[in-house]
């Protein structure tokens, strides 16, 4: 008997794993066997799963465990002089940045070393970091990566912590040293077949990499030259150069063997049209192609809306407008209100007459991955991840008013749809607001975001709410469509559409046409005075008053 089966089929002709998941009852072993047979015959439609319509297909981007890795011929095992060990030395009392992570991952995937030893002068960690989690990612994704403190006996700090210790290691045991901002543009595995290879920046001020056998006379000679600042091609045969990449759009480095990275973040490489961009994407995402968002799962996002409410509360007029906008503008099949059922009041009683409004009892989540949830808003985050992963649909906060239908948007087939926040966060190029979030059930982004909550910080409101979602987007950008018109964020009645070039200036409102530019408006804090009650709305003017009156004019059967 085969229960709840997730079946992976490998296509020899394309070297691609395909995932087939049964939608109904997987107890029928004959159906499973038929899937394998049909796939082997090439008869199963890879887009629809037709041949057996009770099956659907999804391309799982994480099945290929070796994405971005160089393949190794057997000849790589022979005629190597240099030990297959890579060394880095980190002299700063802070954690690493993305450029350092990219350097180390490039070494791991392209050089395929036995191990990478990362020597540090200080005990570093990224436990309290907001953006730079790259060290933790190395420690959990690179099996051969290890960290070691510089030995207390090391007494040559007058020369600098970094290269001099590395030279001492190579002189003793051999191997390969890479600068912590080094990035190869071509395969460097050939250097292990030479007893000594070195590359520097063009002025020879900085060593890019050194590969050496232990006790090498050429290495000893080079060390003397480097101390005396006499490194030049005439004295160092076969000397290679690595250029510094001051700007990621530089094209003069296309034919270089290697480069040194300056400040860089993942979003800069997602669509970068250059040799470096292609290689960086291969290392980061396992595919050199520019990031393109395509559906992984079949069908479209379900036209159902999820909302969350806990606690004894009389539904106020602002909340009424929000839910009414969902029922009349979005016009969903169902609206599920998840919570403890303590929401009440005349406005709720009116809206409950619509049988599309359904209450789903749920206990208040108090922990996630064993960590206490303090903020009520974070409890909503936990629930929306769980609900959307299970059922899909549209999540909407209680301070979101919908302005136009979403049918065309969800018909495009994207697995997940969201948009950036207007609020700048230290160290972040952008942040993400999930007050409006659309997703198919089982969407990859939602699962990865839920997984990221293992890093939940109980007392850090913004980290959990808008920073972690961005980190998920940064790591899996191909799984999510960023729709800048999905919601306009407002704060203290000033609105900041993310499609406006100055949207990050939250002290000044940016203009937009609410009647046609956006799907929804998210007024956050405070509630507009016009929404205090019906009388206030009737006597108010301005954009928020116009929006409120627009919602009241929408046809509702139970008015």
What is each residue range found by the language model?
Residues 1-163, 180-380, 398-559:
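Glycosyltransferase-associated regions of secretory-pathway enzymes
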Residues 176-178, 394-396:
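Short aromatic-hydrophobic micro-motifs that form the base-stacking/packing surface
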Residues 162-175, 381-391:
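Small-residue hinge/turn detector
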């Amino acid at each position: 008997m085969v229960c709840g089966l997730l079946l992976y089929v490998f296509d020899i002709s394309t070297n691609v794993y395909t995932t087939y998941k049964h939608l109904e009852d997987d107890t029928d072993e004959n159906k499973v066997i038929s899937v394998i047979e049909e796939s082997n015959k090439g008869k199963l439609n890879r887009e629809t799963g037709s041949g057996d319509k009770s099956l659907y297909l999804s391309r799982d981007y994480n099945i290929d465990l070796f994405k971005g890795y160089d393949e190794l011929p057997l000849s790589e095992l022979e005629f190597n002089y240099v030990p297959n060990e890579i060394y880095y030395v980190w002299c700063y009392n802070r954690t690493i940045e993305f450029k350092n992570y990219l350097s180390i991952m490039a070494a791991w995937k392209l050089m395929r070393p036995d191990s990478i030893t990362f020597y540090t002068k200080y005990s570093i960690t990224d436990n309290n970091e907001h953006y730079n989690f790259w060290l933790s990612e190395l420690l959990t994704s690179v099996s051969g990566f290890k960290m070691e403190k510089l030995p207390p006996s090391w007494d040559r700090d007058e020369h600098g912590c970094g290269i001099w210790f590395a030279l001492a290691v190579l002189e003793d045991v051999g191997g390969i040293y890479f600068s912590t901002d080094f990035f190869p543009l071509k395969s460097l595995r050939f250097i292990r077949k030479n007893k000594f290879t070195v590359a520097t920046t063009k002025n020879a001020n900085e060593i890019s990499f050194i590969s050496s056998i232990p006790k090498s006379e050429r290495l000893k000679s080079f060390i003397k030259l480097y101390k005396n600042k006499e490194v030049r091609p005439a004295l160092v045969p076969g000397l290679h150069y690595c250029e510094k990449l001051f700007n990621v759009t530089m094209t003069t480095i296309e034919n270089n063997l290697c480069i040194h990275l300056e400040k860089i973040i993942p979003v800069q490489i997602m669509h970068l049209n250059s040799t470096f961009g292609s290689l960086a994407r291969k290392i980061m995402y396992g595919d050199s192609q520019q990031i393109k968002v395509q559906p992984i799962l079949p069908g479209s996002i379900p036209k159902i809306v999820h909302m969350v409410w806990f606690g004894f509360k009389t539904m106020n007029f602002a909340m009424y407008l929000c839910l009414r906008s969902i029922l009349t503008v979005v016009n969903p099949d169902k609206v599920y209100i998840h919570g403890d059922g303590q929401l009440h009041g005349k406005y709720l009683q009116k809206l409950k007459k619509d049988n599309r409004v359904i209450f789903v009892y749920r206990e208040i989540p108090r922990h996630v991955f064993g960590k206490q949830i303090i903020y009520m808003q974070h409890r909503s985050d936990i629930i929306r991840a769980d609900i959307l992963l299970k059922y899909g649909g549209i999540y909407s906060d209680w301070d979101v008013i919908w302005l136009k239908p979403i049918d065309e948007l969800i018909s495009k087939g994207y697995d997940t749809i969201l948009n950036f926040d207007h609020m700048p966060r230290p160290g972040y190029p952008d942040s993400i607001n999930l007050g409006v979030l659309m997703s198919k059930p089982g969407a990859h982004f939602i699962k990865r975001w839920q997984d990221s909550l293992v890093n939940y910080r109980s007392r850090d409101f913004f980290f959990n709410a808008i920073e972690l979602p961005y980190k998920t987007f940064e790591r899996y950008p191909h799984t999510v469509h960023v729709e800048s018109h999905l919601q306009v964020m407002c704060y203290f009645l000033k609105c900041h559409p993310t499609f406006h070039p100055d949207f990050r200036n939250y002290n000044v409102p940016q203009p937009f046409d609410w009647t046609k530019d956006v799907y929804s408006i998210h007024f956050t804090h405070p509630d507009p005075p016009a929404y205090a009650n019906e009388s206030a709305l009737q006597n108010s003017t301005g954009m928020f008053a116009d929006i409120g009156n627009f919602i009241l004019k929408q046809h509702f059967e139970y008015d």
